[in-house]
Regions:
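Bacterial N-terminal signal peptides that target proteins for export
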Residues: 1-8
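Exported/periplasmic ABC-transporter solute-binding proteins
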Residues: 21-311
Length: 311
């Protein structure tokens, strides 16, 4: 009889664990743990501007939140929310699929590429690029010119799409084969040349994929990748650090450049790669499935502090 009772108890414990009736169950009465990117982040800029809290895009003072978690990259945000059942943050839509997080409906609209293109999902921003206004040698300048042309081809656009970039690939877009003869540098051996890429961590995966593919089309040119945030884009190509040891030949930003103030880039040296969206995200165990602009503002300004005020 004792053996039967013991086996029954063990079975009940096991079943309870499978059913989630332990203390691992999501408790909506728990405190909300808020995460944000650092103040130099383009994703942060796009998020707070998008929800109508633009005063917080470069300043933590408007965020009246105890225990605010600040992370330095898209990857750090993903890891933080994956390890915090009660956390909420925001990431690039291009990173959502492989993140292991739940992307919340925003203003009742699912975060999908289709909904971005049709204009119903509105928490969006551009992925932008900037190049140097002058180079250390003509070869680098010619390689960058060829790379910019590659971005407008069917192959380049398809790669951006495959990495989560939102844009149309048209049959009228040129193929690389149809334009490569215009860029003689690509037919040379460029294996002793290194192009320095950097900037936004949200754009890093896309930029690396584009560089890997273009290297094969451009005489095996090398690319060095160093991504620490959108603020590096102007600073290390045309700004204060353009001649430092950490200079960049081409850089990427997940926000628009401040052309009328601190980032007065030379005309013709910057542009847009594609559209991206920003997605509010929570842990998979969180029962919240959608969020509004007003709710996000109230969370990040300390008005809402418990999950049961949202769910």
């Amino acid at each position: 009889m004792k053996k039967v009772l013991k086996l029954t108890s063990l079975l009940l414990i096991a079943l309870c664990g499978l059913a989630g009736c332990s203390n691992k169950e999501f408790n909506p009465e728990s405190d909300i743990k808020l995460y944000t990117r650092d103040t130099t982040s383009g994703t942060r800029d796009g998020f707070f501007t998008g929800i109508g809290l633009s005063e917080a895009k470069e300043d933590n003072d408007p965020l009246k939140v105890e225990g605010l978690g600040t992370v330095e990259s898209n990857g750090d945000m993903i890891n933080s929310i994956k390890n915090d059942k009660y956390g909420i943050g925001y990431i690039s839509m291009s990173s959502l699929e492989d993140s292991g997080l739940k992307g919340l409906y925003y203003e009742g609209v699912e975060p999908t590429e289709e909904n971005v293109l049709n204009g119903t999902y509105t928490l969006t921003r551009n992925f932008n690029y900037i190049i140097r206004s002058e180079y250390e040698n003509i070869e680098k300048e010619q390689i960058i010119d060829a790379f910019l042309a590659y971005l407008g081809t069917q192959e380049g656009k398809t790669t951006m799409q495959s990495e989560g970039g939102i844009l149309e690939v048209k049959t009228s877009d040129p193929t690389w084969d149809s334009i490569k003869d215009n860029y003689a540098i690509t037919l040379e051996d460029n294996s002793d040349i290194t192009i320095n890429f950097g900037g936004s961590t949200s754009v890093s995966k896309m930029a690396q994929s584009l560089a890997d593919e273009f290297s094969d089309l451009c005489g095996n040119v090398n690319f060095s990748h160093n991504y620490h945030g959108s603020s590096d884009a102007y600073k290390k190509t045309q700004g204060a650090d353009k001649d430092s040891t950490s200079y960049l030949d081409m850089a990427f930003a997940s926000r628009d450049f401040k052309l009328d103030s601190s980032e007065q880039a030379v005309e013709g040296t910057y542009g847009t790669l594609c559209i991206d969206a920003i997605v509010p995200v929570v842990n998979l165990e969180n029962t919240c499935s959608q969020i509004s602009k007003d709710q996000l503002v109230k969370m990040y300004t300390g008005v809402y502090t418990k999950w049961n005020e949202i769910i």
